C-alpha cells in the first residue's frame, strides 16, 4: 500500500521552527471546536511533517510476519530519535553562534544596546526553553528505542544457557549474565541510556573548569600537586632536610608543616595515610581530577578515553585503579582468562574506599560507582538522571556480583564472605516492585522532586518503571478534565471513572502541542506493538482505560486541525479504535467546505483503510445526537407565527410578517450548519440512498420542530432531494424544472428503480418510496415558506411609495408565485400522512402538521391574494379553488384547522379573497396566468365580476 498522502521527505521543512510549549495553544482553543477551525497564531515546525511522514510510511507496508512488522516499528522509533537528535544538535549550534555574537556586542555601550540586551535575554529564555524541550524529547525516544526491543521480543530470544566450569573471558561471563537475567538486561539498557544522555553534556574540561581555576596553575594540567610539592621543597631547603620528611620528627613538627597539617610525601596515599592535607590549590586540582573521572564513568566513556584524559594530567595511575569493570563497554579491552574472584574482591575494596577512605566526595563517589554503592554516589548527584544512575548502577553491579558468586565456584563464595559490600538488591527489597518504588522515591527526594514532576521526566519515569499504561491513562484523564472544565467538550469526552489521585504537574497540558505530539506517537507505537503481540487493550476490561488514553491522540488531532494540517488528520484518526475513529474524523473535518478538498480527504481515508461509507453514515448521527433531535419537543406549535394581527385588507389580504425567516438571511447556527455539512459529505460517497433520505428527513424534522427556518432553507438549497437522487442514480431523473421544483418526486415514484438498488437496499420498495416522499414533502414546505417570505417582502415594497416597482420586480413576483404554487401542492393533500407496512403516522409528523399547516396555508392565501390584486385575478380564482379543495369531504387540511380552532380565520381569508375577486379588475401586462386551467375547473372571472 502506498503512503496515504504526500509529505516532504526532507527533514528540512519549509515551515518555521515550532514555538515553545508555553507560547502555543491554550486549553480553550483545543477543547472548543465551535470557536475556530483554524488558528493562524500557532506556528508549525518541521517535526510535524516528519513524524507524520514516517508513521505513514510504516502504515503503508503492512506485509510480513509480526516479528518483521515489530522490527519496522522499532525502526520508526529510531527514525524519531535520529531526527530529534539532529534538531537538537542544530539548535545547540545556533545557540552557540548567538551567544558568541552577543559576547561581541557587549563591547559596545549605550542605552540602545541595553534595550537590545533585554531583547536578547528574552530570546535566550525562549531558546533555552526550546532547547530543554528538545533534550527531553531526545531522551524519551532514545529510551524507547533501547527498551522496547527488550519488552517486545520473540520468546526464543535470550534463552538461558547452562553454565559450565570452563575458563571464560570477562565478556563471556558478562554475556552469560545478561542472557540469564531479564531484569539485568533492562537495567543495563537504562544505564546505557543515562550514560548516552550524559555524554551530550558540556565537555569534561568545561565541567571541571571552576575547580581547575581554583587550582591556580594556569594552563598547566600535568605535574600533580604543584603547590604542595613547592611547599615541601621550600621547607626542606630552609631547614636543610635530606630525604623524606617525617611528620613525626620533632623539628618538622615545629616547622611550617605543623601549622597547615600538610602532607610530607607526594604518593597518592599520603593524604589518607598521614591524615594530613594538601595545599588548598592542590585540593581543588585533586577534586577536579576525581570529578572528571566521575563524569567519564557517568557518561560511559571507554577506558581508552579515560586513560587519555588522565595521561594528559600525568595521573595515569588512577585509570588502573578503576579498570576492572566499566560495565563491559564493548570498546574496552577483553580479559581472556577472567577470574571472578578478583572482581569480587576488587568490588569490596572499592566499597571500603567509598565508605572509609578517600579525600573528597568525588573520589569516594568514583569508587562508590565501581563498588555499586549508593550513599557515596548520591552525595554528588545533582539531577534526577544522576540519582537514577546511582541506583541502577548499584543494582546491576550487585546482580553481577551475585551471579559471579553463584557460578564462580567455592573460591568466589569464600572471597565474598571475607569483606563487606553494599547489596543494592536487598536494599531495594522485592524485585517485582523495586523499580516503581525507586521512581516514586525520586518524586519526594530533595534533589529530584522538582524535576520528577516535569511531564517529560514523568513520562521517562513511567517508561523506566514499565508503568506507561498507567501514565497514559492518567494523562488522558487530565486532558479530559481540562477540556471539560468550562463546558462539555465534543472532542475529548468526560469519562465516569472513580476519582484517582494523581498530580496534575506530572502531565502535559492541552496547550503543550509538542508534548501532545510526543504522547500521540508514543501511544500509537505502544498500541501497535501490543497488537502485534496479541494484546488488545481496546476490548474487554481495559477498554475504558484505553479510550481515556486515546485522548492524547484526539488532542493532537485537534491541534492539527487548528494549524490547518487536515491532510494528516485521517492518518492519526486511523490509530483510534471503534466509533471514535469516525467521530474524531468528523469533528475535525466538518469545517471543510470545498468539494475537492472533501474528496481528497475521502481518498486519503480509503488509502488508510478507513471505511468511508461508515464515516459519512456516522456523521449525521453524530450531530443529530449533539442536538438530541429525537428528544426535542415541537416548539414550533407555539413559536411558528408569521401572520400579522389585524383584519385583512382589500389589496393584500391578511398581512404576513416580512423577513419571518430572520433578519440575517444567510446566517445559520453552527450546530445546524454542521448537520447540513454532514449531509453534504454523505452525497460524496456512492450508495447509501436510503440512509441519506432517512437522515435528511430527521434533519428537516429537527429544524421544523425547533423553528430553525433559516437552517431548513439552507438545507433545502444545499442538499436538494432531486440532487440526492441524481447523485446516487445519475440516469434516473431528468433535469429539474425551475418553475416546478417539486415535480421530481412524481418522476421518481413512477420510474423503474434500478435492480441493484432494490437488491442491496435494506428496505422494501414501499418503504423506500415512502421515505423519499417524506423528504419531498418536507422540502416542499420549506421551499414554499421561502417563496412566501419573498412574496411578502415584495408586497411590502409595493406599499412604499418611495420604491417604484420595476418590470423586473413584477416578473420576480410572477416567478415566485409559480414556485409557491408548485411547492404548496404536496402540502395541501395528505402531507406527511403516508406510511408503509401498515404503520401509524409518526408523532413528530403530526406535531409538525399541527404547527405548520394552518399558518402556512393562511399565509399562502395572502400571497395569492396579493398576486391576484397585483398581477392577475386568476390567482384569486385559485384561492377559490383552494377553498373547494379544503372543503372536500375528509380533507386532512380542514381537520387541522378544526383541531387548532382556526377555521374562522380560514373562512375570513377566503372571504377577503372572494371580495377582492369581485371588486378588483386590474391586470398586469405580460403576467402569466392559469386561465385555461381554471376554466377547465369551472372557474370564470366574469362569474365574480360586479358590474355597475
Swiss-Prot record:
Topology versus the membrane: Peripheral membrane protein
GO biological process: mRNA export from nucleus; post-transcriptional tethering of RNA polymerase II gene DNA at nuclear periphery; protein import into nucleus
Gene3D superfamilies per the UniProt record, alphabetical: 1.10.3450.20, 1.20.190.50
Segments for region (Disordered): 1-39
Domain of life: Eukaryota
GO cellular component, one term: nuclear membrane
Record localization: Nucleus, Nuclear pore complex; Nucleus membrane
Record-level Gene Ontology MF annotations: structural constituent of nuclear pore
Coiled-coil region list: 118-148
Biased composition regions of type Polar residues, renumbered to the chain: 11-21
Alphabetized InterPro entries for the sequence: Nup84/Nup107 (IPR007252)
UniProt entry tagged with the keyword DNA-binding: no
Keywords: Coiled coil, Membrane, mRNA transport, Nuclear pore complex, Nucleus, Protein transport, Translocation, Transport
Function: Functions as a component of the nuclear pore complex (NPC). NPC components, collectively referred to as nucleoporins (NUPs), can play the role of both NPC structural components and of docking or interaction partners for transiently associated nuclear transport factors. NUP84 is involved in nuclear poly(A)+ RNA export, in NPC assembly and distribution, as well as in nuclear envelope organization.
Family that this chain belongs to: Belongs to the Nup84/Nup107 nucleoporin family.
Subunit structure: Component of the nuclear pore complex (NPC). NPC constitutes the exclusive means of nucleocytoplasmic transport. NPCs allow the passive diffusion of ions and small molecules and the active, nuclear transport receptor-mediated bidirectional transport of macromolecules such as proteins, RNAs, ribonucleoparticles (RNPs), and ribosomal subunits across the nuclear envelope. Due to its 8-fold rotational symmetry, all subunits are present with 8 copies or multiples thereof.
Protein name (database record): Nucleoporin NUP84
Organism of derivation: Chaetomium thermophilum (strain DSM 1495 / CBS 144.50 / IMI 039719)
Amino acid at each position: 500500500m502506498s503512503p496515504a498522502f504526500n509529505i516532504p521527505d526532507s527533514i528540512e521543512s519549509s515551515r518555521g521552527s515550532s514555538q515553545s510549549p508555553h507560547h502555543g495553544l491554550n486549553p480553550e482553543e483545543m477543547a472548543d471546536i465551535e470557536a475556530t477551525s483554524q488558528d493562524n497564531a500557532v506556528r508549525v515546525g518541521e517535526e510535524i511533517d516528519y513524524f507524520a511522514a514516517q508513521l505513514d510510511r510504516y502504515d503503508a507496508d503492512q506485509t510480513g510476519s509480526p516479528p518483521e512488522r515489530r522490527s519496522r516499528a522499532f525502526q520508526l522509533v529510531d527514525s524519531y530519535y535520529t531526527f530529534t537528535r539532529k534538531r537538537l544538535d542544530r539548535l545547540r549550534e545556533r545557540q552557540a553562534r548567538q551567544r558568541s555574537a552577543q559576547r561581541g556586542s557587549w563591547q559596545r555601550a549605550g542605552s540602545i544596546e541595553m534595550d537590545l540586551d533585554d531583547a536578547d535575554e528574552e530570546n535566550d529564555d525562549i531558546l533555552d526553553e526550546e532547547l530543554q524541550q528538545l533534550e527531553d524529547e531526545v531522551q524519551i525516544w532514545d529510551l524507547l528505542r533501547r527498551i522496547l526491543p527488550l519488552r517486545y521480543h520473540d520468546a526464543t530470544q535470550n534463552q538461558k544457557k547452562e553454565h559450565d566450569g570452563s575458563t571464560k573471558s570477562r565478556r563471556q561471563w558478562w554475556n552469560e549474565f545478561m542472557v540469564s537475567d531479564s531484569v539485568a538486561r533492562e537495567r543495563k539498557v537504562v544505564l546505557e541510556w543515562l550514560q548516552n544522555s550524559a555524554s551530550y553534556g558540556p565537555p569534561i574540561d568545561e565541567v571541571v573548569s571552576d575547580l581547575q581555576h581554583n587550582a591556580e596553575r594556569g594552563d598547566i594540567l600535568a605535574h600533580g600537586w604543584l603547590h604542595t610539592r613547592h611547599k615541601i621543597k621550600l621547607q626542606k631547603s630552609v631547614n636543610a632536610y635530606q630525604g623524606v620528611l617525617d611528620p613525626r620528627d620533632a623539628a618538622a613538627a615545629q616547622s611550617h608543616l605543623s601549622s597547615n597539617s600538610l602532607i610530607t610525601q607526594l604518593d597518592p596515599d599520603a593524604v589518607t595515610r598521614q591524615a594530613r592535607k594538601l595545599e588548598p590549590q592542590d585540593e581543588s586540582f585533586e577534586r577536579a581530577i576525581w570529578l572528571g573521572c566521575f563524569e567519564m564513568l557517568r557518561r560511559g566513556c571507554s577506558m581508552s578515553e579515560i586513560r587519555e584524559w588522565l595521561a594528559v594530567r600525568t595521573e595515569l595511575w588512577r585509570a588502573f585503579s578503576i579498570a576492572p569493570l566499566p560495565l563491559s563497554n564493548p570498546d574496552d579491552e577483553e580479559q581472556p582468562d577472567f577470574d571472578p574472584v578478583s572482581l569480587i574482591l576488587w568490588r569490596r575494596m572499592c566499597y571500603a574506599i567509598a565508605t572509609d577512605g578517600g579525600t573528597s566526595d568525588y573520589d569516594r563517589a568514583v569508587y562508590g560507582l565501581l563498588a555499586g554503592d549508593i550513599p557515596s554516589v548520591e552525595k554528588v548527584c545533582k539531577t534526577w538522571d544522576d540519582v537514577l544512575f546511582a541506583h541502577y548502577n548499584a543494582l546491576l553491579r550487585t546482580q553481577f556480583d551475585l551471579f559471579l558468586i553463584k557460578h564462580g565456584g567455592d573460591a568466589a563464595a569464600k572471597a565474598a564472605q571475607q569483606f563487606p559490600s553494599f547489596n543494592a538488591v536487598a536494599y531495594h527489597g522485592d524485585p517485582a516492585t523495586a523499580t516503581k518504588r525507586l521512581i516514586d522515591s525520586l518524586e519526594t527526594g530533595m534533589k529530584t522532586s522538582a524535576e520528577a514532576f516535569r511531564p517529560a521526566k514523568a513520562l521517562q519515569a513511567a517508561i523506566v518503571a514499565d508503568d506507561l499504561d498507567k501514565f497514559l491513562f492518567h494523562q488522558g484523564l487530565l486532558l479530559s478534565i481540562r477540556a471539560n472544565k468550562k463546558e462539555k467538550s465534543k472532542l475529548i469526552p468526560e469519562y465516569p471513572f472513580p476519582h484517582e489521585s494523581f498530580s496534575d504537574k506530572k502531565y502535559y497540558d492541552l496547550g503543550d502541542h509538542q508534548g501532545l505530539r510526543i504522547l500521540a506517537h508514543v501511544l500509537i507505537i505502544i498500541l501497535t506493538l501490543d497488537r502485534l503481540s496479541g494484546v488488545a487493550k481496546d476490548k474487554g476490561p481495559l477498554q475504558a482505560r484505553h479510550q481515556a488514553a486515546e485522548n492524547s491522540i484526539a488532542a493532537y488531532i485537534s491541534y492539527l486541525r487548528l494549524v490547518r494540517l487536515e491532510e494528516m488528520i485521517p492518518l492519526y484518526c486511523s490509530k483510534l479504535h471503534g466509533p471514535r475513529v469516525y467521530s474524531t474524523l468528523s469533528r475535525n473535518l466538518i469545517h471543510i467546505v470545498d468539494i475537492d478538498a472533501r474528496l481528497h480527504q475521502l481518498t486519503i481515508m480509503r488509502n488508510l483503510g478507513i471505511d468511508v461509507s461508515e464515516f459519512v453514515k456516522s456523521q449525521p448521527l453524530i450531530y443529530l445526537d449533539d442536538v438530541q433531535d429525537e428528544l426535542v419537543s415541537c416548539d414550533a406549535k407555539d413559536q411558528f407565527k408569521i401572520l400579522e394581527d389585524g383584519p385583512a385588507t382589500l389589496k393584500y389580504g391578511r398581512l404576513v410578517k416580512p423577513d419571518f425567516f430572520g433578519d440575517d438571511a444567510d446566517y445559520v447556527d453552527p450546530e445546524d450548519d454542521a448537520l447540513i455539512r454532514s449531509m453534504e459529505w454523505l452525497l460524496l460517497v456512492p450508495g447509501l440512498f436510503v440512509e441519506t433520505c432517512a437522515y435528511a428527513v430527521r434533519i428537516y424534522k429537527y429544524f421544523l420542530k425547533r423553528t430553525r427556518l433559516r437552517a431548513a432553507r439552507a438545507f433545502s438549497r444545499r442538499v436538494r432531494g432531486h440532487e440526492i437522487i441524481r447523485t446516487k442514480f445519475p440516469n434516473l431523473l431528468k433535469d429539474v424544472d425551475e418553475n416546478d421544483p417539486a415535480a421530481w418526486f412524481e418522476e421518481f415514484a413512477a420510474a423503474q428503480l434500478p435492480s441493484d438498488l432494490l437488491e442491496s437496499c435494506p428496505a422494501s420498495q414501499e418503504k423506500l418510496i415512502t421515505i423519499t416522499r417524506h423528504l419531498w414533502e418536507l422540502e416542499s414546505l420549506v421551499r414554499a415558506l421561502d417563496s412566501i417570505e419573498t412574496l411578502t417582502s415584495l408586497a411590502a415594497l409595493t406599499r412604499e411609495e418611495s420604491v417604484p416597482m420595476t418590470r423586473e420586480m413584477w416578473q420576480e413576483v410572477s416567478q415566485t408565485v409559480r414556485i409557491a404554487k408548485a411547492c404548496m401542492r404536496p402540502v395541501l393533500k395528505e402531507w406527511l400522512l403516508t406510511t408503509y407496512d401498515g404503520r401509524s403516522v409518526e408523532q413528530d409528523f403530526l406535531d409538525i402538521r399541527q404547527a405548520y399547516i394552518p399558518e402556512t396555508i393562511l399565509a399562502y392565501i395572502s400571497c395569492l391574494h396579493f398576486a391576484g390584486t397585483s398581477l392577475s385575478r386568476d390567482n384569486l380564482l385559485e384561492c377559490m379553488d383552494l377553498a373547494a379543495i379544503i372543503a372536500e369531504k375528509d380533507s386532512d387540511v380542514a381537520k387541522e384547522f378544526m383541531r387548532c380552532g382556526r377555521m374562522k380565520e380560514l373562512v375570513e381569508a377566503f372571504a377577503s379573497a372572494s371580495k377582492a375577486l369581485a371588486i378588483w379588475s386590474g391586470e398586469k401586462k405580460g403576467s402569466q396566468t392559469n386561465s385555461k386551467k381554471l376554466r377547465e375547473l369551472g372557474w370564470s372571472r366574469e362569474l365574480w365580476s360586479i358590474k355597475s
